[in-house]
């Protein structure tokens, strides 16, 4: 089951709204049985992304947590987990990026960039398209 929601926090205010963010994550954690949580990498330099990472780590203690790669924000990145993608997966990802209306003019939001990163990660593991993640917490590894 995939779930998502949009919360209307103002940009660059999550650190001052940290407790509310944690409370919302805690409520989600209590009302759902998540197998895996995706969040910004622990190496992400953006202040809001750091807050999300910290509060996800606190709230979802019993879930696998993977940090996603955002090269324009990451100081460095550990490519611990590699997941093969299809072209349909990549097209769906590009479509989802359209939800970030305020970011659409940024170079890293274009389809070519998404494809280039997927191809680069694929080269590392002998696949056509791959997304890599930082293993923040792994529960019951395969």
What are these regions, as identified by a protein language model?
Residues 1-2, 31-32, 36, 70-142:
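The feature marks non-catalytic terminal segments
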Residues 1-64, 120-121, 125-128:
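Active-site beta-strand->loop->alpha-helix modules in alpha/beta enzyme cores, enriched
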Residues 62-72:
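Histidine/lysine/aspartate-rich catalytic loop segments that bind and position anionic ligands
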């Amino acid at each position: 089951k995939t779930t998502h929601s949009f919360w209307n926090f103002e940009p660059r205010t999550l650190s001052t709204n940290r407790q509310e963010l944690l409370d919302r994550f805690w409520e989600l954690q209590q009302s759902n049985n998540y197998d895996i949580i995706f969040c910004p990498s622990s190496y992400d330099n953006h202040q809001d992304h750091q807050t999300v990472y910290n509060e996800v780590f606190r709230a979802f203690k019993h879930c696998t947590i993977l940090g996603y790669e955002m090269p324009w924000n990451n100081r460095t990145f550990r490519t611990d987990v590699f997941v093969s993608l299809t072209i349909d997966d990549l097209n769906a990802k590009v479509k989802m990026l359209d939800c970030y209306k305020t970011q659409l003019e940024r170079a890293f939001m274009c389809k070519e960039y998404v494809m280039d990163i997927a191809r680069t990660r694929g080269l590392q593991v002998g696949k056509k398209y791959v997304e890599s993640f930082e293993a923040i917490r792994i529960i019951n590894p395969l």
